[in-house]
Amino acid sequence: MIIKNIFILILFFCYSFSQDYLWPVQASKEITAVFGEERPGRYHTGIDVRTFGEIGYKLIAIDDGYISRIRTSSKGYGKTIYLKLNDGNTAVYAHLDHFTPELDNLVNALHQHYGKYTIDHKLEPNDHPVTKGDIIGYSGDTGGVSGPHLHFEIRNADGQP
């Protein structure tokens, strides 16, 4: 099982970071859960990056693109950003403490408009473009988690991890 996880992790990094992507968080480069790890009734679809039990580390746009979707929920991924990259892939950042001030204002307005905390809002390419290296949010422990960390995924154009 350990060899399988190591192999999957190597494949993930070879594919994901062969594209000159930046590391997604200004915390550690220590991975606490790998892609494909068995979970009750499913497999882990990304990697979890250690944030030393703390919230508030800067999350970085790994490449140029735009924020295509933002979600908030008290379950699952909690506060989440979907960053559509110019290469067609989508980077997913989950369990955020908060977004950038501009996105926080949008999310607060959506919460008020819909009268509920759970939202799933899609944005257009010109709504919120980002440049590689921009700060897009801050790490946290929202949703169904047991402690602060960044859950990070790269999905292909079909939405598959």
Predicted regions and their residues:
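Sec-dependent N-terminal signal peptides
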Residues: I2-C14
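Surface-exposed, glycine-biased beta-strand/turn segments
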Residues: F17-T90, D97-E102, K116-T118, L123-N126, ...
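A solvent-exposed, charged loop/short amphipathic helix patch at secondary-structure junctions
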Residues: V107-T118
